[in-house]
């Protein structure tokens, strides 16, 4: 009997690639195959404009929603071909969609993702699970982070509490202590502002290994101003997005400084946001496991390590690819949805359970 396979396809706040994980799930979670496909530059620029420009038209929104649906479909079909996994063994594909707006502090909070699941269902022939975040919000959560329960399943170790720190465009972490308890929160900017500065001012996608930042000096005045943001005063659990942490948050005077000093300060901002949250929440005496694209920014990891009182490892040191963790989480959430198993949703007052994700299929 062939293994049942669950696919997770993830594009994060950096909108630079679609990461695709193939999981088999039994007593353990096993990554059968991982594939990553870069966003076409033209589409990445369209998404960037849609996120940053409040005056984008409904026509633009509708068109890009379809384009990303086709990109997800093409990427998933390509990954299946490379994996040599039989399509008949695939139970579902869970897609994150591309987040273009995440606004929680409103009377009617919402999180908006694009990437039409109807197209993905039609083009792949698979059952699609999507739109996880809005049921999370409906149940009293913030729609992010979604991954704490998966982190618990993957990284739990008896008598050894862990912080699972995901550094994407936005940083979030899960506190893994008890098998049946979850705790997680967004903590602030990860790569979002760093990458935006590199793209807009240096015409490079990112500062590889943090090499430019490592040569600079911290502007403590700007850093102090950034750390006064009201987001950091909110109680956890909380969520945020590029609506808040983007290039516009930086002062005009600061943007006139040398590139290495700007990037050095932004690394410090990301690192301090993370460490301040860990300390504030009393999670000091446990290991930190880092995953996400920011794990490859050596200077950022170095600064986190120097500020922390915790031992630090990369998820890859534990056998889990730093780039694969989030798409693995979506595959696992897809598995839970098609199995009609509720997920734990963390709210400001208590944890509740609910079915996350909408199911779309193009045939019986």
From Swiss-Prot:
Metabolic or biological pathway, per its Swiss-Prot or TrEMBL entry: Amino-sugar metabolism; 1,6-anhydro-N-acetylmuramate degradation; Cell wall biogenesis; peptidoglycan recycling
Binding residue positions for ATP: 12-19
Catalytic activity: 1,6-anhydro-N-acetyl-beta-muramate + ATP + H2O = N-acetyl-D-muramate 6-phosphate + ADP + H(+)
Keywords: ATP-binding, Carbohydrate metabolism, Kinase, Nucleotide-binding, Transferase
The UniProt record lists the keyword Acetylation: no
SUPFAM superfamilies, alphabetized: Actin-like ATPase domain
InterPro entries for this protein: Anhydro_N_Ac-Mur_kinase (IPR005338), ATPase_NBD (IPR043129)
EC nos: 2.7.1.170
GO biological process, one term: amino sugar metabolic process
MF (Gene Ontology): ATP binding; kinase activity; phosphotransferase activity, alcohol group as acceptor
Top enzyme class: transferase
Family matches, as HAMAP family: AnhMurNAc_kinase
Function: Catalyzes the specific phosphorylation of 1,6-anhydro-N-acetylmuramic acid (anhMurNAc) with the simultaneous cleavage of the 1,6-anhydro ring, generating MurNAc-6-P. Is required for the utilization of anhMurNAc either imported from the medium or derived from its own cell wall murein, and thus plays a role in cell wall recycling.
Entry similarity comment: Belongs to the anhydro-N-acetylmuramic acid kinase family.
Stated name of the protein: Anhydro-N-acetylmuramic acid kinase
Organism of origin: Gamma-proteobacterium EBAC31A08
């Amino acid at each position: 009997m062939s293994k049942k396979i669950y696919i997770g396809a993830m594009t994060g706040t950096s909108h630079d690639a679609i990461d695709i994980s193939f999981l088999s799930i039994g007593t353990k979670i096993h990554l059968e195959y991982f594939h990553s496909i870069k966003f076409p530059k033209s589409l990445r620029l369209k998404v960037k404009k849609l996120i940053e420009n409040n005056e984008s038209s409904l026509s633009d929104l509708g068109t890009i929603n379809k384009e990303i649906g086709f990109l997800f479909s093409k990427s998933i079909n390509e990954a299946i071909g490379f994996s040599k996994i039989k399509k008949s063994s695939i139970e579902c594909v869970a897609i994150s969609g591309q987040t273009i707006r995440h606004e929680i502090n409103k009377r009617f909070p919402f999180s908006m993702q694009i990437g039409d699941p109807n197209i993905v269902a039609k083009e792949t022939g698979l059952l699609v699970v999507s739109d996880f975040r809005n049921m999370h919000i409906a149940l009293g959560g913030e729609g992010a982070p979604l991954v704490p329960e998966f982190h618990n399943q993957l990284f739990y170790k008896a008598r050894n509490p862990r912080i699972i720190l995901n550094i994407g465009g936005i940083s979030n972490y899960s506190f893994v202590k008890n098998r049946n308890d979850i705790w997680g929160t967004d903590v602030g900017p990860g790569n979002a502002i760093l990458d935006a500065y590199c793209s807009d001012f240096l015409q490079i996608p990112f500062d590889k290994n943090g090499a430019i930042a490592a040569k600079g000096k911290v502007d403590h005045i700007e850093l102090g101003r950034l750390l006064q943001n009201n987001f950091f005063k909110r109680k956890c659990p909380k969520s945020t997005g590029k609506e808040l942490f983007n290039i516009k948050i930086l002062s005009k005077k600061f943007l006139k400084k040398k590139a290495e000093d700007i990037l050095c300060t932004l690394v410090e901002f990301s690192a301090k946001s993370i460490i301040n949250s860990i300390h504030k929440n009393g999670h000091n005496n446990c290991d930190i496991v880092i995953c996400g694209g920011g794990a490859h920014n050596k200077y950022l990891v170095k600064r986190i390590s120097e500020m922390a009182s915790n031992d630090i490892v990369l998820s890859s040191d534990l056998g889990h690819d730093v780039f694969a963790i989030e798409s693995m989480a979506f595959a696992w959430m897809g598995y839970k949805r098609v199995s009609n198993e509720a997920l734990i949703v963390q709210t400001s007052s208590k944890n509740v359970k609910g079915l996350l994700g909408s199911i779309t299929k193009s045939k019986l």
